[in-house]
């Protein structure tokens, strides 16, 4: 047995499923998950000594690549002064100044410890501010594991939320309306059915948890208009897209102004950080200035703030996003060309430093139903053959891939060459 296999066997006796987050278990592709020893730049190294070009990037945070010296040094320096104080620090102020300067729609920001905390808190704030209970989310979009967000759609375009996980009471989920991503008619139907009850829409501007599905041109502006028409708040969940699709996020790239924004992943530079913020009048409703309660023992802790501050300063440097776009575009185009040469029907969506691979002859993938119609079995074979070639992709047909500026053009071309060999075997 390999060392990864031995560790996985031991882990399953002690940790549910052997992992601390389900997708890491390779359930979506089969086989034994890799146990990682270290990472540097664009590369992962497993406990068995094998090296991989990494397109997971810790599920998004590693836009600068692994083990970036500026982030590493910032963490070491901060740790020498203490790990956590439970009191305000100067770095929290500096971090808030930086985040609000980079994302102009955020007048104020509150730091938390994860993307789930950010979305959960933003929804509570929207409900408290509007005095309404219902929320709209979209089929196939994931906003963390808060109870009100673990719901799925039924057969219709609009359904009252039904729990998608045991342990979530139906009474919690009943206020969540699920609409169809990229379908404004389903959203209008929800508002017309509950015109005075909907507090907010929460949306991934690029749906990165059903692989990578881009918004149609009219979709995000249409959501803004509907929120304005019916007095609801628009929450854009930029946990995945923030600082990756563009410096000011996908909201800037697509030209839509939210009331609240949720951030995570890149904002922590690899440390556990989330944030939510937006309009001053809305944020003023948050405790201690307002009645909506939110708190956290480790929120804004000095180690995480130091890592995030160092990361965002690097991400804000000129040319970073141009490089990211160039690398991602080259990979997407190369994969399409290689698949076409092999007669493999393939769609590759991409924007900024995100991409998604879909085995389908549909020609385009724009919603959850399109994603579900793709050939998952072929993706499983593709994943394992690419892994054999030394390329680590997301171990699920429903997760986006992530580029970093640490990837070289040689890394990209080698990945395309590997895919060409793999396509010949599919």
From Swiss-Prot:
Principal location listed in the UniProt entry: cytoplasm
Keyword terms, alphabetized: Cytoplasm, Isomerase, Porphyrin biosynthesis, Pyridoxal phosphate
Keyword Cytoplasm tagged: yes
GO terms under biological process: protoporphyrinogen IX biosynthetic process
Tagged with keyword Cytoplasm: yes
Catalysed reaction, written as an equation: (S)-4-amino-5-oxopentanoate = 5-aminolevulinate
Protein name: Glutamate-1-semialdehyde 2,1-aminomutase
């Amino acid at each position: 047995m390999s060392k990864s296999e031995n560790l996985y066997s031991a882990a399953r006796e002690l940790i549910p499923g052997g992992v601390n987050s389900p997708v890491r278990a390779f359930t979506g592709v089969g086989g034994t998950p890799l146990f990682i020893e270290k990472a540097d730049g664009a590369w992962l190294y497993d406990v068995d000594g094998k090296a991989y070009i990494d397109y997971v990037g810790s599920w998004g945070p590693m836009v600068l690549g692994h083990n970036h010296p500026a982030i590493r040094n910032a963490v070491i320096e901060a740790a020498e002064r203490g790990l956590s104080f439970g009191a305000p620090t100067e770095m929290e102020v500096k971090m808030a100044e930086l985040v609000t300067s980079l994302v102009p729609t955020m007048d104020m920001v509150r730091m938390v410890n994860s993307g789930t905390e950010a979305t959960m808190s933003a929804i509570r704030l929207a409900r408290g501010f509007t005095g309404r209970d219902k929320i709209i989310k979209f089929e196939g979009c994931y906003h963390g594991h808060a109870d009100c967000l673990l719901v799925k759609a039924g057969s219709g375009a609009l359904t009252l939320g039904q729990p998608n996980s045991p342990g979530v009471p139906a009474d919690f989920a009943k206020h969540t309306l699920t609409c169809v991503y990229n379908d404004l008619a389903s959203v209008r139907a929800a508002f017309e059915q509950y015109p005075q009850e909907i507090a907010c829409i929460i949306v991934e501007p690029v749906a990165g948890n059903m692989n990578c599905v881009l918004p149609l041109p009219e979709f995000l502006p249409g959501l803004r208009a509907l929120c304005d028409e019916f007095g609801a708040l628009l929450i854009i969940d930029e946990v995945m897209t923030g600082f990756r699709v563009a410096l000011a996020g996908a909201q800037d790239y697509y030209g839509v102004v939210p009331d609240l924004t949720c951030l995570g992943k890149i904002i922590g530079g690899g440390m556990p950080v989330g944030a939510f913020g937006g309009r001053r009048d809305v944020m003023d409703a948050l405790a201690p200035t307002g009645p909506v309660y939110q708190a956290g023992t480790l929120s804004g802790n000095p180690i995480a703030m130091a890592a995030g501050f160092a990361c965002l300063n690097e991400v804000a440097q000129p040319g970073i996003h141009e490089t990211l776009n160039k690398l991602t575009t080259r990979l997407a185009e190369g994969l399409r060309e290689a698949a076409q040469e092999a007669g493999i029907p393939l769609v590759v969506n991409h924007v900024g430093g995100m991409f998604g691979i879909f085995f389908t002859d549909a020609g385009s993938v724009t919603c959850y139903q399109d994603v579900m119609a793709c050939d998952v079995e072929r993706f499983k074979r593709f994943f394992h053959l690419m892994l054999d070639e030394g390329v680590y992709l997301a171990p699920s047909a429903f997760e986006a891939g992530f580029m970093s500026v640490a990837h070289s053009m040689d890394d990209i071309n080698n990945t395309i060459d590997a895919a060409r060999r793999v396509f010949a075997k599919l």
